[in-house]
Amino acid sequence: MTQPPNRQPVRILGIDPGLRRTGWGVIESEGNRLVFIGCGSVEPPDTLPLAERLLAIHRGLAKVLADFAPDEAAVEQTFVNKDAGATLKLGQARGVAMLAPAMVGLSVAEYAPNLVKKTVVGAGHADKNQIQMMLKILLPKAEPPSADAADALAVAITHAHHRVAAARLKAVGA
């Protein structure tokens, strides 16, 4: 007879990177159960030079990491838009968003925006309102102050679901 897996809550930090507003959301996952822990955003002033904005994002995420002590992190991948310069700058913010948790020894998963939407809403082209409606169902205590914080919670939920699925596949030897 096999023993059930030892389920311990895993604290997950989801990050939605951006130069103007980097959203973050922290949840705990235990099996299929999700618990809201906190969310918010890091908002460096637009007047700062790029390097200082990136530093502000790093410092803000470092504070979140210290305050909430997550076990794992997940970051939303960036999409390429028509403005190559904007895409490049967003990529720099994403690099900072991946670096901050890696610097404290966390594994960092990456998820495409369409996968996040499909996981949370069931449709890969869901809009922000649909994501926020599903967040109210999945995390009733969450009241994200911005769409970026809501997106970060969606990234954390996506990671929680994918890690559970991966554990199930591993358990059956697939």
Swiss-Prot record:
Xref: InterPro entries: RNaseH-like_sf, RNaseH_sf, X-over_junc_endoDNase_Mg_BS, X-over_junc_endoDNase_RuvC
EC numbers on record: 3.1.21.10
Entry GO MF terms: crossover junction DNA endonuclease activity; DNA binding; magnesium ion binding
Gene Ontology cellular-component annotations: cytoplasm; Holliday junction resolvase complex
Record field: catalytic activity: Endonucleolytic cleavage at a junction such as a reciprocal single-stranded crossover between two homologous DNA duplexes (Holliday junction)
UniProtKB keywords: Cytoplasm, DNA damage, DNA recombination, DNA repair, DNA-binding, Endonuclease, Hydrolase, Magnesium, Metal-binding, Nuclease
Active site: 16, 76, 148
Residues where Mg(2+) 1 binds: 16, 148
Presence of keyword Protease: no
Gene Ontology biological process: DNA recombination; DNA repair
Cofactor(s) the protein needs: Mg(2+)
Compartmental location: Cytoplasm
Residues where Mg(2+) 2 binds: 76
CC cofactor note: Binds 2 Mg(2+) ion per subunit.
Source domain of life: Bacteria
Subunit structure: Homodimer which binds Holliday junction (HJ) DNA. The HJ becomes 2-fold symmetrical on binding to RuvC with unstacked arms; it has a different conformation from HJ DNA in complex with RuvA. In the full resolvosome a probable DNA-RuvA(4)-RuvB(12)-RuvC(2) complex forms which resolves the HJ.
Described function: The RuvA-RuvB-RuvC complex processes Holliday junction (HJ) DNA during genetic recombination and DNA repair. Endonuclease that resolves HJ intermediates. Cleaves cruciform DNA by making single-stranded nicks across the HJ at symmetrical positions within the homologous arms, yielding a 5'-phosphate and a 3'-hydroxyl group; requires a central core of homology in the junction. The consensus cleavage sequence is 5'-(A/T)TT(C/G)-3'. Cleavage occurs on the 3'-side of the TT dinucleotide at the point of strand exchange.
Family: Belongs to the RuvC family.
Identification of the protein by name: Crossover junction endodeoxyribonuclease RuvC
Organism: Rhodopseudomonas palustris (strain BisA53)
Species lineage: Bacteria, Pseudomonadati, Pseudomonadota, Alphaproteobacteria, Hyphomicrobiales
Underlying gene: ruvC
